[in-house]
């Protein structure tokens, strides 16, 4: 029978190194997924996870409720990612993970992978807080756990989630227009003449404003984003 998070915390507090190892085994992959989605660098994400586990093992006595280990770890991870992001003098080139080798031979899987990549790419056009919220939800956090990880009240999580979803939908639509709408709109083509393909916050804002001002792109976004 597997031990609960609370059991592992209590054992680790008593110096049980095996318990710390179990905490690592249980959460390292999910913490890495969060860190990589924010940092876009595998090596730096791995370093971040190492620091999160090390820091958390040193501060276990500060965890008031041992059953809340998961949101507490993600809260530490969020702070670690924010710190590393601020230390960067410029954005690193994004490393896109090689998913193709892991895909089963199925059209549905290929389509699902393309949709996931589209969402991932569009998320680059969001503010960091929205990206953090999106990734924490993808890691399975919700309700009180999500509030704990974000450091906000539970009632505020619902507001943040609703706003993030709205901005995410607009970001996906804007990315699709940026990729597929230039042939139909000279103004859009001119706007994106120097675009390198990375969907940054600035690009998203510019394209979104353009869509609102030009009917041809508004209409095309509606077609591309139709259910």
Residue ranges and their predicted role:
Residues 136-156, 191:
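Helix-turn-helix DNA-binding module
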Residues 8-11, 118-126, 195-198:
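Short amphipathic alpha-helical boundary/capping segments
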Residues 3, 13-22, 32-51, 61-64, ...:
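Short, charged helix-capping/linker segments at alpha-helix termini
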Residues 113, 123-131, 185-186, 200-201:
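Short helix-coil-helix linker/hinge
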